[in-house]
Amino acid sequence: MGGILYSCRFICCWLIAAAVVREVSAEQLEHAPSPPDNPLKGLVPYSGMAGMTFPHSMEFEYLRLSDLMKGASVFDWQPMEVLLTGIASRGNQAIFRVWVEYPGKESGLPKFLVEQGVKVARWKNDPEQPPAGVSYSPDYADERLVQALESFITALGQRYDGDPRLAYLTAGLLGSWGEWHTWPRDDLFAPVKTQQRVLAAYQRVLKRTPVLLRYPAGEAHSGFAANANLPFGYHDDSFAWGTLDSGKESDRWFYLATLKAAGDSALNKWRTHPIGGEVRPEIWGQVHDAKPEHAKAQDFLTCVEQTHVTWLMESGLFEKRAAPERYRRAVEQVRRMGYDFHVPNATITNEGGRVKVSVSVVNQGVAPFYRDWGMELAALDAEGHPVQRWPVDWKITGLLPGDAPREWSAALPLPKQPTGKLTLALRVINPLPNGKPLRFANTGQDRHAPGWLSLGPLP
């Protein structure tokens, strides 16, 4: 009799367990190319550039310091607001640089500093050498100017750090175009102490919006303040021209050569801070061809892979639509830039009253995703409308190329309506309300709803 009762209990327990674990949906998700206008990566035009003939998610612009700063602690943010609002209205995020001197343009030194007597050197290059035109280099050692730069950076950070309209900013402020040089008049550039104070000001107030510097510098550098161990990225503004290390003494200014000279911290910077830049203007457009015409052009993909670059200004593809083969190659190359996430599989288990979800993701790009954007799951109906959303604490930041798949998991309460016709989907939330969605390299991306990756049916 006892044996019969034991058997009955065993069978009942088995039936209860079977009733609890109702269905499991194990999905092998197919790969598909990701779009070239994923957010915070890719090729970047100047703001409002006519044509806009290549997919993009960001726009770049310069701003003159004197247009923004009217007194030691008096600022006019209207030009910045017009810029950011205009870019955001197109679903894009902004990269900007503020300058004090720009070859060929009038000085950007604020009027109150001119009236205080800050000296400005007017000079012109040999026309055979860029930058062409007249330059106005202020005395970067003048304490009044240095304090003004610190004041401006502080106000900028307090107002705009973490603003969802902003993608990145380049440090600017010092040197021609804000590029931290006054070549060939190196004697007019900012002394190291001024550079250090500018960097310290950025470090104090820009905690969320990434700041990028023009030149890597180690402790032993004679002309630049050491920055390899500071929380900044870099921008290579002679990309695919002065990028790869040639080993020649005359090319020691090339980007990868300067990285090596700055040490391991600079070489590994891309793991935690973004790399950007600009394709050298002489090779705009053609750099994407199988055989660029210009003899000095370096292989674009090799440069991407060795620098781990995330974004690049490249006006050549935005001035007019490229020929079909150039366009096709450029799209493929942009996919290699920055992050490129693929979800190979997902498992969805209905346990009666809740759903367990596990998802694997890999990064097949050349760099991580640097911003801490939120993520959420949703149950989508047949029309692609979310009938229920579940915020999840999953992180997509810090996943490096070549890392083992990152595993995400969550237990969710079942939606109130029957699950049979619902699809479980995932998205990364762009904090810019109408910003480009981050899209995965999967056929299920946007299948049931724009911006959502369909993981599988809710069992």
Regions found by a protein language model. Give the residues of each.
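Active-site groove signature of glycoside hydrolases
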Residues: 125-145, 152-188
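Bacterial N-terminal signal peptides that target proteins for export
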Residues: 1-12
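Non-catalytic accessory regions flanking glycosidase/transglycosidase catalytic cores in CAZymes
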Residues: 24-86, 93, 145, 151, ...
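Conserved, mostly hydrophobic/aromatic
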Residues: 59, 87, 156, 169, ...
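Extracellular/luminal regions of secreted and cell-surface proteins that mediate adhesion/ECM remodeling
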Residues: 331-459
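Catalytic-core regions of glycoside hydrolase
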Residues: 28-48, 88-92, 168-175, 182-318
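N-terminal substrate-binding region of glycoside hydrolase catalytic domains
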Residues: 27-145, 267-326
